């Protein structure tokens, strides 16, 4: 039975991706910090699933996770944190913790799994965001981290293509999704938000088709298409206004 490891599996898109892969016959390794939520999901998925309570900000813990599950066919890097607010007022340690989860854990898992995947084949799905396409005032470090994931994914994908390696890397860039993430950072997802179930289905189907960039929804596809047509300074103004409006709707106005 093929095996898939999914980080951020306790809720939202990660949980729904785990369900999608389980339905496709994958043994799933469910990774997150919330043990109780993972147990609940494992019970729902059945016997062919394992839970791993790991703080992905701890690189030693990430390395131990790999050592327990070296035979993975699909790696899904879905765990992510966000910090909303003005950059100057954001706590530096919280930002470092976010970057550890959003970037360092993802990068370490890719480095760990790629050698074996190149020998036996595999797929990597990195969950970024449409935030990767724009500068993000009031969400600056989060947007920047997703841009890193986006560029890293495409760069390593090209390296693998030139090596003719049997591995594909896909990067998933959804717009707003109705998940607990929005409540945690204190913003409203907005009227155009998609469900995590729909997002997961798009992500998994796109990954198995070998797509480089997966962008669900017409509006999201258009935003990616037009992101390079105008100066980033223009988009920064637009994003600031949108984020401020979401902040007010989410009840996090200060």
Predicted regions and their residues:
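Conserved glycine-rich cofactor-binding loop
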Residues: 10-11
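Conserved glycine-rich Rossmann-like NAD(P)H-binding loop of the short-chain dehydrogenase/reductase
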Residues: 24-40
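Conserved NAD(P)H cofactor-binding loop of Rossmann-fold oxidoreductase domains
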Residues: 78-83
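Substrate-binding pocket helix/loop in short-chain dehydrogenase/reductase
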Residues: 86-87, 94-99
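Active-site helix of classical SDR
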Residues: 110, 145
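Residue(s) in the substrate-gating loop at a strand-loop-helix junction
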Residues: 129
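C-terminal helical subdomain
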Residues: 171, 188-224
């Amino acid at each position: 039975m093929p095996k898939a490891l999914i980080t951020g599996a306790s809720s939202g898109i990660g949980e729904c991706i785990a369900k999608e892969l389980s339905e496709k016959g994958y043994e799933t390794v469910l990774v997150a910090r919330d043990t109780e939520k993972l147990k609940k999901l494992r019970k729902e998925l059945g016997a062919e699933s394992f839970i791993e309570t790991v703080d992905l900000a701890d690189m030693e813990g990430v390395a131990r996770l790999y050592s327990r599950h070296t035979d993975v066919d699909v790696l899904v890097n879905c765990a992510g944190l966000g910090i909303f607010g003005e950059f100057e007022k954001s706590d530096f340690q919280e930002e470092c913790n976010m970057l550890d989860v959003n970037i360092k854990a993802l990068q370490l898992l890719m480095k760990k799994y790629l050698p074996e995947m190149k020998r036996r084949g595999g797929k990597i799905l990195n969950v970024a965001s449409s935030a990767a396409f724009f500068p993000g005032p009031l969400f600056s470090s989060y947007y920047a981290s997703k841009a890193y994931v986006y560029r890293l994914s495409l760069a390593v994908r090209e390296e693998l293509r030139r090596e003719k390696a049997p591995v594909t890397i896909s990067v998933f860039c959804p717009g707003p999704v109705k998940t607990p993430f929005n409540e945690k950072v204190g913003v409203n997802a907005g009227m155009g938000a998609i469900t995590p179930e729909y997002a997961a289905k798009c992500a998994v189907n796109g990954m198995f088709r070998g797509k480089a960039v997966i962008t669900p929804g017409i509006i999201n596809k258009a935003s990616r298409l037009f992101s390079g047509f105008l100066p980033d300074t223009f988009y920064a103004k637009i994003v600031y206004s949108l984020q401020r409006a979401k902040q007010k709707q989410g009840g996090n106005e200060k």
